[in-house]
């Protein structure tokens, strides 16, 4: 894990109930009842997204039989990124990864306080509820889904929507940082406070 934002001029992230926990998973498919988690990462930020700390990144071991069931897109994407090889070499189970991630997060936020933050995060939550249920309960029941702003921006401000280009690396940690950057972009360009009314 790495503190990616602390510097001599910027303090390290401190424990606070308003801190945000960002999460991303890579899976073998989209169905939590038949597919499995193959990578998971977390990043914790302060509420204004100015300070961030990376947590552990885990490739989750899955059997060759499970990996063989992936469709062509997943085989190509995760093969090209090297994730399939990392999954085969890993000895980490879902339960082990969940326990270590929860222990890491406990240093920065109390259970039940942070929403689960990310892009299309409801999908990650479905897999977590199926394969890491105790870890899923660490989060507040609410989600902070950047995809909501994306879809609103696409409909209401299409020019602004087109201004953020994703790299689509499809690795968990890179996708988290991209989600944080995307939310910062919408905050600057889309979530613009109204000008105060002039005095009568």
Swiss-Prot record:
Keywords, sorted A to Z: Cytoplasm, Exonuclease, Hydrolase, Nuclease
Location of this chain's protein in the cell: Cytoplasm
GO molecular function per UniProt: 3'-5'-RNA exonuclease activity; nucleic acid binding
InterPro entries cross-referenced by the UniProt entry: Exonuclease_RNaseT/DNA_pol3, Oligoribonuclease, RNaseH-like_sf, RNaseH_sf
Pfam families documented for this protein: RNase_T
Active site, per annotation: 141
EC number: 3.1.15.-
UniProt KW Transferase keyword: no
Domain (Exonuclease): residue spans on this chain: 20-183
Presence of the UniProt keyword Cytoplasm in the record: yes
Group of enzyme by EC: hydrolase
Coarse class of the protein's main subcellular location: cytoplasm
A GO term from the CC aspect: cytoplasm
Residue pairs linked by disulfide bridges in the UniProt entry: none
GO biological process: DNA metabolic process
Domain of life: Bacteria
NCBIfam families xref list: PRK05359.1
Function: 3'-to-5' exoribonuclease specific for small oligoribonucleotides.
PANTHER family recorded: OLIGORIBONUCLEASE, MITOCHONDRIAL
Similarity comment: Belongs to the oligoribonuclease family.
HAMAP family per record: Oligoribonuclease
Protein name, UniProt field: Oligoribonuclease
Organism from which the protein derives: Burkholderia vietnamiensis (strain G4 / LMG 22486)
């Amino acid at each position: 894990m790495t503190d990616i934002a602390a510097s001599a001029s910027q303090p390290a992230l401190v424990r606070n109930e308003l801190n945000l926990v960002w999460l991303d998973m890579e899976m073998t498919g989209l169905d939590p009842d038949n597919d499995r988690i193959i990578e998971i990462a977390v990043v914790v930020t302060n509420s204004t997204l100015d300070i961030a700390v990376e947590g552990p990144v885990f490739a989750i071991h899955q059997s060759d039989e499970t990996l063989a069931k992936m469709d062509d897109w997943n085989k190509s994407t995760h093969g090209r990124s090297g994730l399939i090889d990392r999954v085969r070499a890993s000895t980490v189970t879902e339960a082990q990864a969940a326990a270590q991630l929860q222990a890491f997060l406990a240093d920065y936020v109390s259970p039940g306080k942070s929403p689960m933050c990310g892009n299309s995060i409801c999908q990650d939550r479905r897999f977590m509820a199926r394969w890491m249920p105790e870890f899923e309960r660490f989060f507040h029941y609410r989600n902070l889904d950047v995809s909501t702003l994306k879809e609103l921006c696409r409909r209401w401000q299409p020019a602004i929507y087109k201004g953020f280009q994703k790299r689509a690396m499809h690795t968990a940690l890179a996708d988290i940082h991209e989600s944080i950057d995307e939310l910062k972009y919408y905050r600057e360009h889309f979530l613009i406070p109204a000008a105060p009314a002039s005095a009568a």
